[in-house]
């Protein structure tokens, strides 16, 4: 029984569950998608909130440049490159034996400074927002001051009386632990069994307390939440429900618009933009997709990609039960090499907020992630961690889908030929050489 209903009844009502339970790569194109002008109201946040977050990051830029010299060239703004990957596109055409019209680009959040993943957006933003609240309330800075003063010993001593806590499969903990420690906070990261050892080691090297669990992500989050509950000096970063995290990710969209403009890429109804976002609990891709819908409206089509063993958002939105169901309820084990996506229960906040804004969801098996990892390195010389490749099959899934999605959305052959597909590469820039070598060897063996 699942939520009081026999499994057979679930399968009768939701036939796509059969593929999810069998761990078969599958896709579902959302029939409930609505015009963005209407569906954006579901989120409970708006353009003014994203602009406020962007302004906050601007205020902190002098401090970031001071604490992290690698950001000095961008003036303390944490941003990633946008690159066309035409050779990888050609390799995918061969790999999938399909034409795959349009152009293919890669958003390299894998190489964001400070923590080398998309979590350098939301995670760092939430810690900065919390630090700003404390600093303003306690007279450490004023809104118009130079925030680099927060690196001074008296400010660090003040922050040392406060703790930041988070539950993570790895990358979120890495970003929050590093920025928290850099500001002077005590930081504790509750890490699930999936977390890579090198990420734990890196955090400890920064003076962060790492608490390890034999269980999965949801348990780590719950323990982190419990630690913070009774302590007014502890701020818990709630990856399942945080609006600050969500807004930190959403800021990416306006910056991407500038990068697309600079590259001469049009985005409108005749030149659609498809953005393929790896999804774990949902905060990162949800926030980015929200920002994209604000920036491009119905001209952008956002799709979430998940491992076959951890399809939590697909499951939650498809059944309409969101965080009430986990993949484990259906006998799916939530064990995947895509450690950043190893989440069994989705964010109910993101699922409900975004369910009418997302075009679809698809799953990818681990072997395919490794093949694509090796294929990208072979064709473009770009190295990513497995979870960052989840969006790479998206161009083929959209082109070949049999569910009437393209017709429903008015995606004619001419529009698909004019399309830009953007794979959001979420992590991998800080993977140790030996570990990356093992990833590549596994991928090459599967390809050859």
UniProtKB/Swiss-Prot annotation:
Its cofactor is pyridoxal 5'-phosphate. Its EC number is 4.3.1.18. Disulfide bonds: none annotated. InterPro entries: D_Ser_am_lyase (IPR011780), Ser/Thr_Dehydratase (IPR050147), Ser/Thr_deHydtase_PyrdxlP-BS (IPR000634), TrpB-like_PALP (IPR001926), TrpB-like_PALP_sf (IPR036052). It is an enzyme of class 4 (lyase). One of its GO terms (biological process) is isoleucine biosynthetic process. GO terms for molecular function: D-serine ammonia-lyase activity; hydro-lyase activity; pyridoxal phosphate binding. The keyword Lyase applies. Keywords: Lyase, Pyridoxal phosphate. It holds the Pfam family PALP. It comes from the Bacteria. The modification N6-(pyridoxal phosphate)lysine is found at residue 119. It catalyses: D-serine = pyruvate + NH4(+). NCBIfam families: D_Ser_am_lyase (TIGR02035), PRK02991.1 (NF002823). This is Probable D-serine dehydratase. It comes from Pseudomonas paraeruginosa (strain DSM 24068 / PA7). The lineage of its organism: Bacteria, Pseudomonadati, Pseudomonadota, Gammaproteobacteria, Pseudomonadales. The gene is dsdA.
């Amino acid at each position: 029984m699942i939520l009081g209903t026999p499994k057979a009844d679930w399968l009768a009502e939701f036939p796509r569950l059969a593929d999810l339970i069998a761990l078969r790569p599958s896709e579902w194109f959302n029939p409930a998608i609505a015009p963005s002008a209407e569906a954006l109201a579901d989120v409970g946040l708006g353009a003014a909130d994203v602009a406020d977050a962007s302004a906050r990051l601007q205020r902190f830029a002098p401090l970031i440049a001071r604490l992290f010299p690698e950001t000095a060239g961008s003036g303390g703004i944490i941003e990633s490159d946008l690159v066309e990957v035409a050779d990888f596109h050609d390799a995918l055409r061969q790999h999938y034996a399909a034409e795959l019209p349009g152009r293919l680009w890669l958003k390299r959040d894998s190489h964001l400074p400070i923590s080398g993943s998309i979590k350098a957006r939301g995670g760092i933003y939430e810690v900065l927002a919390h630090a700003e609240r404390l600093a303003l309330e306690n007279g450490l800075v004023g809104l118009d001051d130079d925030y680099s003063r927060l690196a001074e010993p008296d400010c660090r001593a003040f922050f040392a009386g406060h703790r930041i806590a988070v539950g993570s499969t790895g990358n979120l903990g890495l970003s929050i632990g590093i920025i928290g420690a850099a500001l002077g906070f005590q930081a504790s990261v509750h890490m699930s069994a999936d977390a890579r050892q090198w990420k734990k080691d890196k955090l400890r090297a920064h003076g962060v307390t790492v608490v390890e669990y034999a269980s999965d992500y949801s348990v780590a989050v719950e323990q982190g939440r419990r630690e913070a509950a009774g302590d007014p000096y502890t701020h818990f970063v709630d990856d399942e429900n945080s609006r600050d995290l969500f807004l930190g990710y959403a800021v990416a969209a306006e910056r991407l618009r500038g990068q697309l403009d600079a590259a001469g890429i049009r985005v409108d109804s005749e030149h659609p933009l498809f953005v393929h976002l790896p999804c774990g609990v949902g905060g990162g891709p949800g926030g980015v997709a929200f920002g994209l819908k604000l920036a491009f409206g119905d001209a952008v089509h956002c799709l979430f990609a998940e491992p076959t063993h951890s399809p939590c958002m697909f499951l939650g939105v498809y059944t309409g039960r969101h965080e009430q169901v986990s993949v484990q309820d259906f006998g799916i084990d939530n064990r995947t090499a895509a450690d950043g996506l190893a989440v069994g229960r989705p964010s109910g906040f993101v699922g409900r907020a975004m369910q009418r804004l997302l075009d679809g969801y698809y799953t990818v098996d681990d072997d395919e992630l490794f093949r694509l990892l090796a294929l990208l390195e072979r064709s473009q010389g770009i190295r990513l961690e497995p979870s960052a490749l989840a969006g790479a099959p998206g161009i083929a899934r959209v082109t070949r889908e049999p569910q009437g999605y393209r017709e429903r959305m008015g995606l004619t052959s001419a529009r698909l030929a004019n399309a830009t597909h953007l794979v959001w590469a979420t992590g991998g820039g800080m993977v140790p050489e030996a570990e990356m070598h093992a990833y590549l060897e596994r991928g090459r063996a599967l390809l050859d």
